[in-house]
Amino acid sequence: MIQMQTNLDVADNSGARRVQCIKVLGGSKRKYASVGDIIVVSVKEAIPRGRVKKGDVRKAVVVRTAKEVRREDGTAIRFDRNAAVILNNNNEPIGTRIFGPVVRELRAKNFMKIISLAPEVL
């Protein structure tokens, strides 16, 4: 469950290390984002010579949340930290590698590139 001002780790090699959610996309009254939702983020911490710089405002997709995600078969999955992948204007990842596991729910939301780059899909 991601809302405005939530800090997230970045799960790709775009150059950003930490980002902060500044908007949840999907309607003016929408308060929370979960796995597979697109948010607008501000880069708070970045590595030198990365593709994104500190202060950049970008779109990102949430790939891991500390709040559990319920599935139709009754199981739930949760992670230790919140994480996101930075996207370009075509909703494709900026980075060429994904770090850590991602959830199956991304497949239903057509983030196939992230699914294929991820080392593990839970």
Swiss-Prot record:
Q: Write out the GO biological process terms.
A: translation
Q: How does it assemble?
A: Part of the 50S ribosomal subunit. Forms a cluster with proteins L3 and L19. In the 70S ribosome, L14 and L19 interact and together make contacts with the 16S rRNA in bridges B5 and B8.
User: Gene3D superfamilies, per this entry?
Assistant: Ribosomal protein L14
Function statement = Binds to 23S rRNA. Forms part of two intersubunit bridges in the 70S ribosome.
What is the primary gene name for this protein? Answer: rplN
Q: Which UniProt keywords apply?
A: Ribonucleoprotein, Ribosomal protein, RNA-binding, rRNA-binding
What cellular component GO annotations does this protein have? Answer: cytosolic large ribosomal subunit
Q: Which PROSITE patterns match?
A: RIBOSOMAL_L14
* Molecular functions (GO terms): large ribosomal subunit rRNA binding; structural constituent of ribosome
InterPro entries xref list: Ribosomal_uL14, Ribosomal_uL14_bac-type, Ribosomal_uL14_CS, Ribosomal_uL14_sf
In the record, the note on similarity to other proteins reads: Belongs to the universal ribosomal protein uL14 family.
The name this protein goes by in its record: Large ribosomal subunit protein uL14
